[in-house]
């Protein structure tokens, strides 16, 4: 568990998801945002953006902001009360992020997600496409769990795992968990003075997972255990993950400058992880037959456009898996389709510019985006 020569660096990442917990963002004394701290984080984000990185924020804090304002601080909240607190606090949280990012000429965009948005294929495609468009427009998406509607049975439960799912969904190459601790230790350093800091974790073994404990008291619903669960998700999806202390101003700058932290090494790259999932974990619902020109385009890593599709079989919904067959009848790949079978039938053989006339609305140009393709070409 010693640092390898090629230990990752934040400056090397091109798409970064940053998770920030309630205890860092909300001042427990007066239940308000730590505005100077938040402004320093946004300055760090602006610096990362200036270096060419795309940044997505996963931010807790809505419930913590609201429960003090509404006088519900002395007892554990019921689920319906948490949902009400989220509705109240989310407004102030979004306003705080918007103002702080605007100070660096950055535009904030708010998204509230539930597990279904990352696990249901159709909603997954919608959420990912929205995030990609926001990044293309130069925005900084600020994401939180949609606590106002999520139930106990269908919720992430903590934003560490939400951050990992967002990293997985967007193909991020780095997930940063800013915390009240500077990484993983062999034991809880607050209770065991002999605990040793672990700078790099190369494999998520049972021994590593056993180092997680119960969540500490206070605002945060997460603890080291949830961070290790997030690390397992993120590293399997091809993202490096880092746990770093975030209490002081400019925590990302300090991380870039070599501050104490723990890196969890990606077990693959994001593209390969996604293509393995598409290629081997789902059952196909239909088949598209393509012409020679479309095959050549796929060989050059292009998306599958409707003009190159000559035939369609099966009944499928948006986000379902379909097989791709070339003109010789060979199955050359599979992918997640952006339209259902009825709409796809209307589109095949037509140019993307005709989509609006054919469907009555302007949809996505590709039947299958290149990121949703897993090819098996000879």
Curated annotation (Swiss-Prot):
One of its GO terms (molecular function) is glutamate 5-kinase activity. The keyword Membrane does not apply. SMART domains: PUA (SM00359). Pathway: Amino-acid biosynthesis; L-proline biosynthesis; L-glutamate 5-semialdehyde from L-glutamate: step 1/2. It catalyses: L-glutamate + ATP = L-glutamyl 5-phosphate + ADP. Its main location: cytoplasm. GO terms for cellular component: cytosol. The keyword Nucleotidyltransferase does not apply. Pfam families: AA_kinase, PUA. Substrate binds at residues 60, 147, 159. CDD domains: AAK_G5K_ProB, PUA_G5K. GO terms for biological process: L-proline biosynthetic process. Its EC number is 2.7.2.11. InterPro entries: AceGlu_kinase-like_sf, Asp/Glu/Uridylate_kinase, G5K_ProB, Glu/AcGlu_kinase, Glu_5kinase, Glu_5kinase/COase_Synthase, PUA, PUA-like_sf. Residues 285-362 form the PUA domain. It is an enzyme of class 2 (transferase). Gene3D superfamilies: Acetylglutamate kinase-like (3.40.1160.10), PUA domain (2.30.130.10). ATP binds at residues 19, 179-180, 221-227. It comes from the Bacteria. It is found in: Cytoplasm. Belongs to the glutamate 5-kinase family. Catalyzes the transfer of a phosphate group to glutamate to form L-glutamate 5-phosphate. NCBIfam families: proB. This is Glutamate 5-kinase. It comes from Gluconobacter oxydans (strain 621H). The gene is proB.
